[in-house]
Structures are given as structure tokens and as C-alpha cells.
Amino acid sequence: MQNKMIPRPDQSGTNSCAAIIVAAGLGVRAASGGKFNARQDSSFGNDNFGHNLPKQFWRLGDKPVIAHAFDYFHRHPAIATIILVVAEPYITHMANILPETQKPIHLIAGGATRQDSVRAGLIALARLKDCQNIGYVAIHDAARPL
């Protein structure tokens, strides 16, 4: 059987890629006491370290962990759309810290498990009117930006 080569996404726009960034975890193992009180950070540049938030919102260097992952996919020329999957209580918080962008960004609620959140992201992608132009999907955990 001969392997069929599938072209990879590139800058020519022949195959678009969607990024699903999964950030719906509450990070209870990383928290002391397992309790969070969402702060209303209004930008990636806020000086709070954010330990009262899930770890994807903790500061790493000059911005939250999730911002590092988001920025990478946002800058990548093959990424046509980004779907951010966030725990329901943090959707407003995420919306407040997102920078303005030219790429379509879709913010949706995640599920009880990582698998449920990935499924929610894929369902949201399938519902986009131009999803037939997406040839690849990159699924990334926001809490692992490096």
C-alpha cells in the first residue's frame, strides 16, 4: 500500500488550519486550597500574578500563560481561525483579556473533561460557515505554552 502524501498548511493559503486552544480546566491541583476568585484583569499587561485564577491565566513573564499560546497561533500564517475553549465562569474574563485581532476568534464554554472540551471545540468549528475550507486542526492545551 502506497502512502498518500497530504500537503501541509503553508503561507500560500492552499490548506487553512484552525487552532483549538483548550483552556477549560480549573487547575485545582495547581492551586493552594483549590479555590479561585476570578479577578477582572483587563489586559495581558496586568501586574497581578493571578494565583487566584486557573493556571492558564497565571502570569508567565509579561503576560498570562494562555496569551503565549494564543499569540503563537495568532501570528502563524496558516491559522485561519482560533477557537478558545474556556470554563463557563471564565468566559467573560477571557473576553476581557483578548487583544483585538483580524483573525476570527470564537470563545466557547468547555466541558467537564479535556475530551469534552476538545469535542466542544470541534463542534463549534463544524458549525462555522466556512469550515469546509479548513484542512487541518491544531489542538493545544493553553496551560502548556512552551
PLM features: what roles do these ranges have?
Residues N15-P89, I105:
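N-terminal glycine-rich phosphate-binding loop and ensuing alpha1 helix
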Residues G25-V28, E88-Y90, A112-T113, A142-P145:
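Short glycine-rich anion-binding loops that position phosphate/pyrophosphate groups of nucleotides
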Residues F73-H74, L98, L125:
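Hydrophobic C-terminal alpha-helix "anchor/cap" residues
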Residues P77-A78, P99-P104, D130-C131:
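Short helix-capping segments at alpha-helix termini
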Residues I91-I97:
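Acidic helix N-cap motif at the loop->helix transition within catalytic regions
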Residues E100-R114:
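Conserved donor nucleotide-binding strand/loop of the catalytic core
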Residues A112-L146:
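Conserved beta-loop-beta/alpha segment of the NTase-like Rossmann-fold superfamily
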